[in-house]
């Protein structure tokens, strides 16, 4: 019985989870002129901006998203990149993420970058 308690203690603390924020960012690839953000341009942006903010890593998933263009009055579907990152709550990181969105919109002439933040428990 003594060993069962020790085993439970080790398992509990080695698998402990921490409270974090999961941030999902959706970067559309279509430009207003009909051209697309190229893979090279995306990789340059990722290395120059995203990797500097998410120094501990992130995941990138190719997705296809839809959004309503209120000026054209129609639903737009486009290829996008979804970036997922888990981080501790911090106003500094939040401002850096806002900056990522700002620069992507400015560089690639985007109306918006969707940002979704949610509280999660993560175990590494």
Model-assigned labels for residue ranges:
Residues 4-12:
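Sec-dependent N-terminal signal peptides
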Residues 41-55:
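Short amphipathic alpha-helical segments
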Residues 53-82:
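Short, intrinsically disordered low-complexity segments
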Residues 18-22, 78-80:
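A general secondary-structure signal for short beta-strands and their flanking turns/coil
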Residues 36, 40-44, 91-95:
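Soluble non-cytosolic domains of exported or imported proteins
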Residues 20-39:
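Terminal, regulation- and interaction-focused segments at domain boundaries
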Residues 75-124:
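Helix-rich interaction surfaces within compact, conserved domain-sized segments
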